[in-house]
Every structure is written in structure tokens, then in C-alpha cells.
A protein has these predicted regions:
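Surface-exposed assembly/interface segments
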Residues: 1-495
Length: 495
């Protein structure tokens, strides 16, 4: 429509800022049978001194109970008799009608009010309200009217079964897992390294080994719900007491591929180096196989006991992310939180035949003693030289996911035009330059693919962009050449 005036238009074709995704989120699966449960919302009315105190409680735990309300009103007496006591629940509000005598004076006891409320039948799918007298009270006191009041104090279950829950580096949160099962000890190993963000999936405990394995597998499947329920995507996947099992290991590997994550797998207690190496040959470029088991002093009993290494390794990875960057290898960095190793692999600097080096060459990581216990090994379970380093894999994951997220949020479904292509390329290239300046990568660039971006493909709504990145590999081997130079520092023997 034509306008006699000034029309305002906004140009949104400028390049968009790309932010690097969070690579330091751990996904943890395990058991915690004594984990804290949710709390039901409550409301207390009346007085214990008057023997008319009543406690109203939501029929289910959770914050939804905080939306419930209660009120008590005096009934209206007719000419012949007083009002009867009754209760009605509608739209989250409980209305109690207090019985009266013929003159309209409330004469119903607190005990009778409790009986009237509890006589209500609630739909099992809906939240209702129960009433009770405090312990030791008879409830003979006369109930008093009160205006609409809300129940309070309802809290959701902090760790519902098979549901991702976030522990944001807090030991107080971790204690809500309870001390039995596996998850508390796993969290302790992680938090001994750093205050990490951990997506925890609690599963049922079962004495039957196969049933327990099935529970763990179901918990691993639940990790993929992290982005949609918590807005966090797990990038380091562990199931410490269970990942010695290849069924669990393969499930973690599969989930790692879906989440663009790395799975850390533990080795069985007292496994030989040869057994560990043979097992590693079953896995690929999303798995790091850990040879050692560590001896940790319990913060509950003070006793030393053997533990899988994967939880400590995951916390160690996050600590290196925080102090140096996610593009750094965690190898040759001191690991915290344990006193000794279950088995010691021979290690000597420069010795190709020591067990630690042989494990590394077979794509297995271990721990060595070198001014503290150091993680020793850069590689994932693949022989592909381009993808065998964990640091390279995680760098590419970070860049790929960051660009993908930005393209999805800012450009997907926008009309295809020259300005769209220019803006997308400018955004990606600007981001890659930032990564170069920050020391994350050596180089990178993006360009439109002229061969694939045909008239037909563009008409079909498909745009092709090529991105080339040069990540930084860790200096896994440093070769130093020495020679004796006889022409310098000559010593004169003349008198």
C-alpha cells in the first residue's frame, strides 16, 4: 500500500555473532537408591493451644503443590437447623464449609473438618489436598474460618529416575544423591578435580545383573534429553561402575556420536595391558579407553578403596578446559583426588618399550608418576591419524556445533538471496578468525560451493557452504637431534 509519509524498514542482513557451545558438560549415569525425594507442599492453620490445628498437605510432592489453596468459611444456618460441615475441591482450591448451630455459630471440631476433607475423592491424575491433625492432638477444638491461603514448601524430586538432572558444581547438591549406590562416589571424584556441570541420570537398582545392565542402558538413552530439558548437552559421557561391560560401552559410544561427545570407558579391575588393548580394538573415534583404576580415600569412612578412573578423568578434562582451553590435551597434566593406583604401568621418559608408551601407541590412556599422577595419552580408539587425538575431535565438535547452532537460529528458513549468502559467510569467517586469534585453531575459512549451489539446488531450498579448519594437534612426540661440535670451546693445553 502506498504511504504519504516516511516508512521505516530494518535491514537484518548484517553478519551474526557466533558463540562457542559449552564443551565442558559431563553426562553421568548410575544408581542412588537413597537419593532425596521431593517435598509435598503444606499449610498449617489453627493453634495447638486451642486443639484446632490442622495441617493440609498436597497429595503429591513437587512445586505444583505450591499452586494449591485452602479456605474455610462459616456455613449458613437455616431457620430450623445449623449448617452442615462439607468440603469441595475445584480448580486447585479447597473450600471448607464449617458447620454451625441454629444461630450460625461455628461449632464443628477440627477433627470433623479433617474427616470431611479426607472424604473427598481426587482424580489420580490430579493434585489434591489431604488434611491431618498434628501428632498428639485430638482435634476437639472448634475450627475457625480463614481466607484463601496457599500451600508452601513443595519441592520437585531433585533426581527423578531416568530423567536428566543438573548438578552445577555443588557438593551440597551431590549430597542429595545419598551415599549408597554409585552416583555419590562418582560425583566426589569429579568434584575433587573441579566444580563441573554434570547432567546426572539416576536409574533403578536391581540385584539381577542383566536387569541392572538394562537399567543403565535406559539411563544412557536419557542423556539425549539434556538439551531439551536442561538446555545443556553432555560432551563427556561416563558410567563409571558399568562401562567395563561392552554392552554399556557400546551404548555410550553410540550416544557420544549422537551428542558429538567423547565416551570415557573404564577397564576391569586387574585387567592386563594386553586385555585392555584387545578391548580397545572394538571401539572407534568417539571413545577413550582408560587403563588404570585409582585408589581413593572415602570422605565418608576414611578408608582407601579402588575406584574406576573415568569420573576423575572427566573432571580432569573439565578442569583443563577451564584453565587452558578445550583445545588442549589433558595428557601430561596432573590429576587430583587419589592416593595411588591399583596397578602401576612401567614408565620411563624416552623409553619406547615401557608399558605406558606401548599402551599409548595402542590408543589406550593410562596414568604415570611424574611429579604427581599425570594422565598419559592423547588418543581415541581409532588409527585414523586425522581423528585419533581427543583434542582435535573436541575442537572440531565445538566449531561444527557452534556454526550449526548459529545457522539454525539466525538463517534457517530465511529467503535465499545474495545478501543471505554474504551474511552467512561473513558470520562463519568472523567466528573462525576469532578462534585463530584466541589460539584455538591454526586457520580456517568458509566459502560457497559453486559446483553444488546450482539453480536447481537453490530452487529446492538447499544452500551449500564449505568450511575448512586446521585444528591444533598435541605435540605427542618431540624429536631433539644432538651433535658434538668440536669447533667451539677448544681447550688449550699449551703451558
Amino acid at each position: 500500500m502506498e504511504l504519504h509519509g516516511v516508512r521505516t524498514l530494518e535491514d537484518d542482513s548484517a553478519p551474526k555473532q557466533i558463540t562457542t557451545v559449552n564443551m565442558s558438560v559431563i553426562g553421568l549415569v548410575g544408581t542412588a537408591p537413597d537419593a532425596a525425594s521431593g517435598t509435598a507442599a503444606t499449610l498449617s492453620t489453627g493453634s495447638s493451644l486451642l486443639d484446632n490445628q490442622i495441617v493440609f498437605t498436597a497429595t503429591a510432592a513437587g512445586t505444583a503443590g505450591n499452586q494449591l489453596q485452602v479456605r474455610a468459611v462459616a456455613g449458613e444456618a437455616d431457620s430450623s437447623a445449623g449448617a452442615e460441615t462439607g468440603a469441595d475441591f475445584e480448580d486447585g482450591a479447597l473450600t471448607i464449609t464449617l458447620g454451625t448451630d441454629a444461630e450460625g455459630v461455628v461449632d464443628v471440631s477440627a477433627a470433623d473438618v479433617v474427616a470431611a476433607v479426607n472424604a473427598l475423592m481426587f482424580d489420580t491424575e490430579d493434585m489434591g489436598i489431604d488434611a491431618a491433625l498434628p501428632d498428639g492432638m485430638v482435634g476437639d477444638g472448634v475450627a475457625a474460618p480463614f481466607s484463601l491461603m496457599a500451600l508452601q514448601g513443595g519441592e520437585d524430586d531433585p533426581f527423578p529416575l531416568y530423567t536428566p538432572a543438573l548438578i552445577a558444581g555443588s557438593r551440597n547438591q551431590a549430597k542429595k544423591l545419598g551415599y549408597s549406590g554409585t552416583l555419590y562416589d562418582d560425583m566426589n571424584d569429579i568434584l575433587n578435580q573441579v566444580g563441573a556441570q554434570v547432567i546426572v541420570v539416576r536409574v533403578d537398582t536391581d540385584e539381577d545383573e542383566e536387569a541392572q545392565r538394562a537399567n543403565i542402558l535406559q539411563g544412557i538413552e536419557s542423556l539425549q534429553l539434556g538439551p531439551s530439558t536442561l538446555n545443556y548437552q553432555p560432551r563427556i559421557l561416563i558410567a563409571p561402575e558399568w562401562s567395563t561391560d561392552d554392552g554399556v560401552g557400546k551404548a555410550l559410544e553410540s550416544m557420544a556420536a549422537r551428542c558429538r561427545a567423547i565416551a570415557y570407558l573404564d577397564s576391569p579391575s586387574m585387567a592386563t595391558p594386553a586385555e585392555v588393548v584387545r578391548r580397545g580394538q572394538r571401539y572407534g573415534a568417539r571413545v577413550e579407553l582408560l587403563r588404570p583404576r585409582i585408589n581413593v580415600v572415602s570422605d565418608l569412612t576414611g578408608k582407601t578403596r579402588g575406584r574406576p578412573y573415568s569420573a576423575a578423568a572427566a573432571g580432569h578434562r573439565v578442569r583443563i578446559d577451564s584453565t587452558k582451553g578445550y583445545w588442549w590435551s589433558k595428557s601430561n597434566q596432573v590429576v587430583l583426588g587419589f592416593s595411588s593406583l591399583e596397578q602401576v604401568d612401567s614408565f620411563m621418559i624416552g623409553d619406547e618399550t615401557c608399558v605406558a608408551n606401548q599402551l599409548n601407541q595402542a590408543n589406550v590412556s593410562t596414568l604415570v608418576q611424574l611429579d604427581g599422577f599425570r594422565h598419559w595419552g592423547n588418543r581415541l580408539c581409532t588409527d585414523d591419524p586425522q581423528w585419533r587425538f581427543e583434542a582435535v575431535r573436541r575442537t572440531m565438535d565445538a566449531i561444527e556445533d557452534s556454526i550449526q547452532l548459529s545457522m539454525t537460529k539466525e538463517y534457517l528458513d530465511a529467503p535465499i538471496s545474495k545478501s543471505l549468502g554474504v551474511s552467512m559467510l561473513s558470520s562463519i569467517n568472523s567466528y573462525l578468525r576469532q578462534q585463530m586469534t584466541g589460539g584455538v585453531i591454526i586457520g580456517g575459512s568458509a566459502w560457497l560451493d559453486d559446483e553444488l549451489n546450482t539453480v536447481a539446488s537453490l530452487a529446492a531450498g538447499v544452500v551449500y557452504i564449505n568450511v575448512a579448519v586446521t585444528p591444533k594437534s598435541p605435540a605427542e612426540q618431540i624429536v631433539i637431534k644432538y651433535a658434538i661440535n668440536k669447533n667451539t670451546g677448544q681447550v688449550s693445553l699449551a703451558a
